């Protein structure tokens, strides 16, 4: 079931086309954001595209050709008008030379070298470029920074493995290895300062209003758990939680709720499931002295009883120690945890007794909410005597194996539920009537509505249901929306979907706004969107040519608008500002690079192979 749920979850993040061939080409496309542009896009965007195997850089309507055909990994600092890239290094097959061009006095300069023999990855922030360069003396990478304005290169640290940049931030973060210990440092141009030791996961979020870093390090207080931190651009790392056991990164949308789980008392204590009635009495059991049990006839029978009691106590102590060690090493625990959400208002508790693997949806924004399978822990049904008996007949390893099975069996489903934090208080309501193995659950972006997409018995189409949540988070009742759905995507308070017959490559695009479904387009092969009034639609898909093509439309101001015909479906990009760059192919096979910014489509260049950067 988990595999199916994971597969269903992935459908939220990628658009499923009606035809299998369309799926492949659409999944690589960047989601469209709101169309913005007061000046002609062809004169404001920075773009890089391929022509005759060489890269062409376009800045503010000016162009230059990079003669080195190995040029790739282009990055842009739009404020300075610079485009950075790398080329294969002549010094080594595995290293690169770092270069850039820039717009000066209305013209693009010739390529300039920043440094030779750098490693694969680099980053750009606040006009500076950060990269790694192998230091032969120490046999590890140096972390280097260059400011093209003063043409100065400096080393900010040795033995660096990874660098993380944040948009608009003067500081960067990097990982430096101390033996096997991954240490995260913060560097703001002065001396690097240590941010955290024993770091595990690190994620950088850019291209948003508040760029930030989220990272975890091994907990100093709880084995198997981590400390969870956030570091916003321009700020210092702040602790979110000191005993996280799981974090829902895949569901996280920057600026919204970050869901994570901590151990409850039941989840860290095996004794909640295995009854240990000897725990207190064993503290007073000591090894008997023979001299205390002498009688006229020798050692009394009471001595043998006391010795057996002591030996049993030693076995129980060994079992307790082995169980505690297994729990401390994270080898097993009761899968019933407490769910929290980190929000702009701070940390909010969402629910108790949650198995992180059985959370089926989480509201990205608004008051924290989750749809999950409520778990019930059955405690104390196995006695310590049972474990002692196994240890006497076998060994401690078999005891641990048996205990793990008991712990797993102790957690049973208490039914589907919706849990939320409403006004600072946790609430939970039943959510029944769904077959979890065939249903994908999702919240609307604002968390005010539940959507359920139920796959048909053949597994080919979906039926859409919705359920509004009242002010207490309680579902108001399921409402059927539509059937025969082949692809979908959620917006702030609704869902856009493609409805098509099985075996048919086209269908109609609808938007459900909470009250009714409104038809937006017909004869569509696929669609992409970020907001309900900015939808990109592909029609007349053709896969017979060497390059699959389709006609490109946008849905704006309540109507369809054609952007270009015969557009290569795997060769168009969208900038963060919503400008669309595409390649159209005419009947002769000629390929033209076009730009659309919400006004008219403009042809920028011809004989274009692919678009590699659009900013």
Stretches found by the model and what they are:
Residues 5-24:
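N-terminal Sec-pathway targeting helices
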Residues 570-585, 589-593:
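C-terminal structured domain segments
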Residues 69-80, 116-127, 158-169, 198-207, ...:
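Repeated scaffold domains used in trafficking and secretory/extracellular systems
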Residues 51-68, 92-113, 138-157, 181-196, ...:
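Surface-exposed loop/turn elements that mediate protein-protein interactions on large endomembrane-trafficking
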Residues 30-67, 71-76:
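An edge-strand/N-cap motif at the start of beta-rich repeat modules
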Residues 164-166, 172-185, 189, 193-239, ...:
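Solenoidal tandem-repeat scaffolds enriched in leucines and small polar residues
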């Amino acid at each position: 079931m988990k595999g199916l749920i994971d597969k269903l979850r992935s459908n939220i993040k990628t658009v499923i086309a009606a035809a299998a061939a369309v799926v492949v080409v659409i999944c690589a496309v960047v989601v469209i954001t709101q169309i913005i542009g007061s000046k002609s896009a062809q004169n404001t965007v920075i773009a890089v595209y391929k022509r005759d195997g060489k890269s062409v850089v376009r800045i503010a309507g000016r162009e230059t050709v990079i003669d080195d055909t190995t040029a790739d990994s282009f990055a842009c600092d739009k404020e300075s008008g610079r485009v950075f890239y790398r080329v294969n290094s002549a010094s080594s097959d595995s290293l690169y030379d770092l270069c850039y061009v820039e717009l000066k006095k209305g013209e693009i300069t010739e390529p300039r070298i920043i440094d030779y023999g750098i490693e694969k990855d680099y980053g750009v922030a606040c006009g500076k470029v950060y990269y790694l360069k192998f230091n032969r003396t120490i046999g590890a990478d140096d972390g280097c920074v260059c400011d093209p304005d003063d043409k100065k290169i400096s080393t900010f640290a040795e033995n660096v493995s990874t660098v993380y940049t944040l948009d608009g931030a003067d500081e960067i973060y990097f990982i430096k290895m101390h033996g096997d210990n991954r240490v995260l440092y913060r560097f703001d141009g002065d001396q690097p300062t240590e941010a955290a030791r024993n770091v595990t996961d690190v994620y950088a979020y850019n291209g948003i209003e508040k760029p930030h870093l989220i990272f975890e390090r091994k907990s100093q207080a709880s084995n198997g758990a981590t400390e969870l931190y956030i570091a916003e651009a321009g700020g210092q790392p702040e602790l979110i939680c000191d005993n996280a056991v799981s974090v829902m990164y895949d569901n996280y949308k920057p600026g919204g709720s970050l869901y994570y789980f901590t151990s409850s008392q039941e989840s860290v204590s095996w004794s909640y499931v295995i009854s240990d009635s000897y725990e207190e009495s064993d503290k007073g059991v000591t090894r008997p002295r023979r001299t205390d049990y002498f009688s006229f006839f020798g050692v009394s029978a009471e001595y043998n009883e006391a010795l057996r009691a002591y030996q049993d106590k030693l076995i129980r102590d060994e079992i307790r120690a082995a169980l505690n060690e297994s729990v401390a090493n994270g080898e097993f625990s009761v899968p019933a945890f407490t769910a929290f959400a980190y929000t702009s208002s701070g940390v909010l508790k969402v629910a108790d007794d949650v198995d992180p693997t059985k959370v089926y949806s989480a509201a990205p924004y608004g008051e924290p909410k989750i749809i999950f399978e409520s778990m019930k822990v059955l405690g104390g049904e196995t006695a310590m005597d049972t474990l002692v008996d196994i240890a006497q007949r076998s060994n401690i390893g078999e005891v641990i194996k048996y205990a793990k099975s008991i712990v797993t069996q102790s957690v049973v489903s208490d039914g589907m539920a919706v849990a939320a934090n409403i006004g600072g208080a946790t609430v939970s309501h039943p959510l029944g009537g769904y077959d979890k193995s065939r249903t994908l659950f999702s919240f609307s972006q604002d968390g005010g509505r539940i959507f359920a997409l139920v796959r048909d018995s053949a597994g080919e189409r979906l039926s859409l249901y919705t359920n509004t949540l009242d002010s207490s988070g309680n579902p108001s009742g399921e409402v059927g929306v539509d059937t025969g759905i082949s692809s979908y995507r959620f917006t702030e308070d609704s869902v856009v979907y493609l409805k098509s017959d099985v075996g048919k490559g086209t269908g109609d695009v609808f938007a459900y706004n909470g009250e009714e479904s409104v038809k937006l387009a017909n004869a569509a092969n696929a669609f992409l969107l970020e907001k309900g009034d900015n939808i990109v639609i592909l029609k007349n898909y053709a896969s017979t040519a060497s390059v699959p093509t389709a006609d490109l439309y946008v849905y704006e101001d309540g109507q369809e608008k054609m952007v270009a015909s015969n557009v290569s479906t795997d060769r168009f990009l969208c900038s963060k500002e919503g400008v669309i760059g595409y390649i159209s192919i005419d009947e002769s096979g000629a390929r033209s690079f076009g730009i659309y910014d919400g006004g008219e489509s403009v042809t920028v260049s011809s004989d274009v192979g692919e678009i590699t950067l659009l900013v």
